[in-house]
Amino acid sequence: MRSIRIIAVGRLKTAHWKTAAEHYLTRLTRAFKVEETIIKDGNAALPPLERNAQEGARIVAALTPADLAVCMDETGRQFTSQQFSAFLTPMWENANLRPCFIIGGAYGLSDEVRGKARHTMALSAMTFPHEMARVVLYEQLYRADAILRGTPYHH
């Protein structure tokens, strides 16, 4: 079974985002082994750079040699859904690596985490709250699989 890992800073706190994320995670687990790693939010009393560094150290510590890190960042490469499915195909075909999507917290990702990335990807040129970004990523992963399988989810 193909494997996907998502590392995200902070638990989903808003009920509708939590419900939407669970909906797509349930769909994803039909086709993938999905590992979701939630990183504790950095100390809110810290300045943003220090908070990012704290969260970044936790993310880096969670990475494994099997993780092909894809950082989610507004400055990253943008894809159509078709392009995203094509981008994922070689990752899913590599038995030794799994795509590992990394979603930062309120202030994004630290430079240390960005330095570990094989790829940097943007969901849009717009900025999203990290809870929404997580749901959009889950939906796009599900859609990419539907495109590759030729199921009617993607029109």
Swiss-Prot record:
- Coiled-coil stretches noted in the UniProt entry, renumbered to this chain: none
Main localization category: cytoplasm
Subcellular location(s) per record: Cytoplasm
Broadest EC class assigned to this enzyme = transferase
Q: Which UniProt keywords apply?
A: Cytoplasm, Methyltransferase, rRNA processing, S-adenosyl-L-methionine, Transferase
Q: Which reaction does it catalyse?
A: pseudouridine(1915) in 23S rRNA + S-adenosyl-L-methionine = N(3)-methylpseudouridine(1915) in 23S rRNA + S-adenosyl-L-homocysteine + H(+)
Give the residue range of the signal peptide: none
InterPro entries, per database record: Alpha/beta_knot_MTases, RlmH-like, tRNA_m1G_MTases_N
Q: Which CDD domains match?
A: RlmH-like
Tell me the residue numbers annotated for binding S-adenosyl-L-methionine: G104, L123, S124, A125, M126, T127, F128
EC number of the protein? 2.1.1.177
Q: Does the keyword rRNA processing apply?
A: yes
Q: Which domain of life is it from?
A: Bacteria
The cross-references to Pfam families, in alphabetical order and at most eight, read: SPOUT_MTase (PF02590)
GO molecular function annotations of the record: rRNA (pseudouridine-N3-)-methyltransferase activity
Example of a GO cellular component annotation carried by this entry: cytoplasm
As for family, the record states: Belongs to the RNA methyltransferase RlmH family.
* Record's subunit section: Homodimer.
| Function noted in UniProt | Specifically methylates the pseudouridine at position 1915 (m3Psi1915) in 23S rRNA.
UniProt name for this protein: Ribosomal RNA large subunit methyltransferase H
**Record gene name:** rlmH
